[in-house]
Amino acid sequence: MKIHEYQGKEILRKFGVAVPRGKPAFSVDEAVKVAEELGGPVWVVKAQIHAGGRGKGGGVKVAKTIEQVREYANQILGMQLVTHQTGPEGQKVNRLLIEEGADIKQELYVSLVVDRVSQKIVLMGSSEGGMDIEEVAEKHPELIHKVIVEPSTGLLDAQADDLAAKIGVPAASIPQARTILQGLYKAFWETDASLAEINPLNVSGDGKVTALDAKFNFDSNALFRHPEIVAYRDLDEEDPAEIEASKFDLAYISLDGNIGCLVNGAGLAMATMDTIKLFGGEPANFLDVGGGATTEKVTEAFKLMLKNPGLKAILVNIFGGIMRCDVIAEGVIAGSKAVNLNVPLVVRMKGTNEDLGKKMLADSGLPIISADSMEEAAQKVVAAAAGK
């Protein structure tokens, strides 16, 4: 789950991290009111969407008068903001963050992630803040410094001070940076975040260290422990299909391809998508119906996939362990009839009640293309999507 910048800053503030004064605004008049409350002489008008690169897309403006605040708020609110993370369709801006201006002398980067290679929590820092860290990692990996943080001890003073010095924090400002880094770690750990990022971390001309941006991603599996985080959820920023899928306990993620995938088990779902790509196809979605799929869930899964206007074919790939193949077959038949399926459907089933499931599909009278292996299924669905 993602949240907005202003919400991330609210979290940081709770953990002792210095952030600029600011408030969200949902209308032009509200933006002006917030600016007047903050006082001048400089304000920053920032689009709030769940994507980076807002400044380059025209979603961040510096205003030097109240009238400019009004002008920029009017420009940004309601715009379809396109960044390198939104795709060409962009994301509609429904809210703003109005913030006091900052004296920017030095822009740094810090973040916390779970590193899958070392299986550790890693604090990363760089002197190259204010830009895409992926670009820095690719072109200048030597500028990214890493510290492994042990949960049993937390981020130690010496670790924080060492990283701060390496990324260029002046010696006199290192105690402030330490407070921010340790606060960021505590926020990351205590909220079950999967990412906590400050970009940029600013050092002003007088040596004051503040977080000018905040980005958090949270582990959705841990949200039951954090109702205060769930309250930050903005459904306008999420894929409607994914929201609908969650109502039926379906793990669904929209992708850019044209081949729908309905699979049981996340590992098999990823392997299925990889195999489709191996044979030249492009998956339209990740869809895991889980081990307790019912006819209703399978029908809803078909409905979700068919809402994609670019869908050309569907592959159902089931391994019947806990989930019986005859139950899936029943759901496939009912789902196909309920939605008047009009795209080619390839089904591959292996495992419990496999023969019964295949017989049910064969006797259904539906134009289902059967396959015995994942390789065969992928080849057939790629060919079907291409109209062959």
Swiss-Prot record:
Record's keyword terms, sorted: ATP-binding, Ligase, Magnesium, Metal-binding, Nucleotide-binding, Tricarboxylic acid cycle
Residue span, ATP-grasp domain: 9-244
UniProt xrefs under InterPro entries: ATP-grasp, ATP-grasp_succ-CoA_synth-type, ATP_grasp_subdomain_1, Succ-CoA_synthase_bsu_CS, SUCC_ACL_C, Succ_CoA_ligase-like_bsu, Succinyl-CoA_synth-like
Ligase in keyword set: yes
SUPFAM superfamilies the UniProt entry points to: Glutathione synthetase ATP-binding domain-like, Succinyl-CoA synthetase domains
Single GO MF annotation: succinate-CoA ligase (GDP-forming) activity
Record note on cofactor: Binds 1 Mg(2+) ion per subunit.
Residues binding ATP: K46, G53, R54, G55, E99, A102, E107
Annotated positions binding Mg(2+): N199, D213
Cofactor field: Mg(2+)
Catalytic reactions of this protein: succinate + ATP + CoA = succinyl-CoA + ADP + phosphate; GTP + succinate + CoA = succinyl-CoA + GDP + phosphate
Superkingdom in the source lineage: Bacteria
Cellular component aspect of the GO annotation: cytosol; succinate-CoA ligase complex
Entry's family note: Belongs to the succinate/malate CoA ligase beta subunit family.
Assembly mode: Heterotetramer of two alpha and two beta subunits.
Protein name as it appears in the record: Succinate--CoA ligase [ADP-forming] subunit beta
Organism: Burkholderia vietnamiensis (strain G4 / LMG 22486) (Burkholderia cepacia (strain R1808))
Upper classification of the organism: Bacteria, Pseudomonadati, Pseudomonadota, Betaproteobacteria, Burkholderiales
